[in-house]
Amino acid sequence: VHLTDAEKALVTGLWGKVKPDELGGEALGRLLVGYPWTQRFFDSFGDLSSASALMGNPKVKAHGKKVLDSFSEGLKHLDNLKGTFASLSELHCDKLHVDPENFKLLGNMLVLVLAHLLGKDFTPAAQAAYQKVVAGVATALAHKYH
């Protein structure tokens, strides 16, 4: 993904204001609520029967944190997202068989949750920069798909 130095500074600066453990659970939970067909990948997570069950589910929160920890690592390597996410791409392609479109959906949820959490600090420029990043991450995660 091509980001200017200003966009990189904006993305990493704002990232320091969020708590990935909270943000990840919120974004993943919203994905599972808004796009219920994505729940099929999380059968082992227990009660996914309603929005409140999903949003309060400790396994959803834990996996959301794991996702955001990986995203945080990606922010350290914005010039090499494909390399950074190569093993996760392979896992999601070959073992989990996740539809790569889901990566885009989760990225959009992440941007929405960031906008909500950061309020006025999440300027149009910040949104544009984050949209580039989540698109780049989604592309990197889809890289190993045939």
From Swiss-Prot:
Heme b binds at residues 63, 92. GO terms for molecular function: haptoglobin binding; heme binding; hemoglobin alpha binding; metal ion binding; organic acid binding; oxygen binding; oxygen carrier activity; peroxidase activity. It comes from Peromyscus californicus. PROSITE patterns: GLOBIN (PS01033). The modification N6-acetyllysine is found at residues 59, 82, 144. This is Hemoglobin subunit beta. The modification N-acetylvaline is found at residue 1. The modification Phosphothreonine is found at residue 12. InterPro entries: Globin, Globin-like_sf, Globin/Proto, Hemoglobin_b, Hemoglobin_oxygen_transport. GO terms for biological process: hydrogen peroxide catabolic process. Residues 2-146 form the Globin domain. Keywords: Acetylation, Heme, Iron, Metal-binding, Oxygen transport, Phosphoprotein, S-nitrosylation, Transport. One of its GO terms (cellular component) is blood microparticle. Belongs to the globin family. The modification S-nitrosocysteine is found at residue 93. The modification Phosphoserine is found at residue 44. It comes from the Eukaryota.
